[in-house]
Amino acid sequence: MAAMMASITSELLFFLPFILLALLTFYTTTVAKCHGGHWWRGGTTPAKRKRMNLPPGAAGWPLVGETFGYLRAHPATSVGRFMEQHIARYGKIYRSSLFGERTVVSADAGLNRYILQNEGRLFECSYPRSIGGILGKWSMLVLVGDPHREMRAISLNFLSSVRLRAVLLPEVERHTLLVLRAWPPSSTFSAQHQAKKFTFNLMAKNIMSMDPGEEETERLRREYITFMKGVVSAPLNLPGTPYWKALKSRAAILGVIERKMEERVEKLSKEDASVEQDDLLGWALKQSNLSKEQILDLLLSLLFAGHETSSMALALAIFFLEGCPKAVQELREEHLGIARRQRLRGECKLSWEDYKEMVFTQCVINETLRLGNVVRFLHRKVIKDVHYKGYDIPSGWKILPVLAAVHLDSSLYEDPQRFNPWRWKSSGSSGGLAQSSSFMPYGGGTRLCAGSELAKLEMAVFLHHLVLNFRWELAEPDQAFVFPFVDFPKGLPIRVHRIAQDDEQE
């Protein structure tokens, strides 16, 4: 544990000058524009300030506010010392200064739902400009209003329940088996790396029909790794910085997508049905009026969204299950039953009916998402003055609904830091309704993750084949940390042992 924290701390210290410079740059271009020196009060008139009842809180240090405390590394199964101390002192709704902006932080389940349900009316998505700079201005993550609705509609149509059943389920199973069958017996490797390999290859295939293992696919994956390092770095476009390297990788990735697009347009112009490919690129070209730039950003952002969060959720499931043999046993029994029914039908591939029978598997998935919190918080901006639970939240302020704080709230979840998938077995049990209404791993409202059903399908199918074919344990101690996104410092090294087929069929 100490070694992991030391490693993370040294990484934080390495990036500290870049973060400080970025914040100072942001301050000189944005925060300093606030008039009258009353930026903490939102630039309101003296009369209005007297009437406002802002949430309690503190501004922190000049320029940087409380950003470093908020971003301090901590275990993923906790909210961190900063949040714990602020909630204990100020309550679940408090004000702060984060990322160079006046901010309200919400650990309140009701307010978080209120924020997500009032997207476009009282609040709107507001990520740092650097995210738009690297993902693209047409990325669904940063778009608001009608452009976002149009992009989301395309994604939802492509990920419809019909396509999930007929196209994506077989693809998910095929890519799962490609990964698992390559594992040598009694071998040791990074589970996080394998999860990333699985989800990346799946998304590359379904976005642009790129096959796993091919040189072009591997080259794209290497560029994507560099790209991801820049997404979570300080936005300094200087030679040698992670952000600068990420922008170069972005250009290389877009170059691949553009070449694929040109090839596809040429094929479509010849109306050659034999070469038609049922992927998102073809869908966007045929089913929408998007511009070339919009399609490029759409495909890049979905490659990002469909790969990063799903792979981390899968790695977390492997980690949590390793520490809960009882859950592994119940999971294996559920999937042995499904496998037996497959054999009786004379089938060897999963059907949609098989997937719907994975009841305990869904409990494991829910508990993994609740405890691991891949998406910790969301960036929103207040676009109209809001009054909630006696507090005034001024227009123009940032507001961060912290999903992790609600998922780890002891008033909503009994023993919240314990992995307990059985808590999801019955919605009629004590606290069932409160759990379901406060459980928001994929966001909510009009910005509910378009790929949430695909993400759950990926986890369920992978776990099906994993528990039927392997036993595993940690090869060395590791734990998921938040810095600022969830990651395993050592990549989650595991040792796997293949289960004999005779044992599987008992």
Curated annotation (Swiss-Prot):
Induction: Down-regulated by brassinolide (BL). It catalyses: a C28-steroid + reduced [NADPH--hemoprotein reductase] + O2 = a (22S)-22-hydroxy C28-steroid + oxidized [NADPH--hemoprotein reductase] + H2O + H(+); campesterol + reduced [NADPH--hemoprotein reductase] + O2 = (22S)-22-hydroxycampesterol + oxidized [NADPH--hemoprotein reductase] + H2O + H(+); campestanol + reduced [NADPH--hemoprotein reductase] + O2 = 6-deoxycathasterone + oxidized [NADPH--hemoprotein reductase] + H2O + H(+). One of its GO terms (cellular component) is endoplasmic reticulum. It is an enzyme of class 1 (oxidoreductase). Disruption phenotype: Slight dwarf phenotype and erect leaves. Impaired response to auxin leading to reduced epidermal cells length of the lamina joint. It comes from the Eukaryota. The chain crosses the membrane at residues 12-32. Its cofactor is heme. Its main location: membrane. InterPro entries: Cyt_P450 (IPR001128), Cyt_P450_E_grp-I (IPR002401), Cyt_P450_sf (IPR036396). Coiled coil: none annotated. Null mutant plants for CYP90B1/DWARF4 produce increased biomass and grain yield at high density planting. Its EC number is 1.14.14.178. One of its GO terms (biological process) is brassinosteroid biosynthetic process. It is found in: Membrane. Heme binds at C449. Catalyzes the C22-alpha-hydroxylation step in brassinosteroid biosynthesis, which is the rate-limiting step in this biosynthetic pathway. Catalyzes the conversion of campesterol (CR) to (22S)-22-hydroxycampesterol (22-OHCR, 22-hydroxyCR) and of campestanol (CN) to 6-deoxycathasterone (6-deoxoCT). Required for auxin responses involved in the regulation of epidermal cells length of the lamina joint. Belongs to the cytochrome P450 family. This is Steroid (22S)-hydroxylase. It comes from Oryza sativa subsp. japonica (Rice). The gene is CYP90B2.
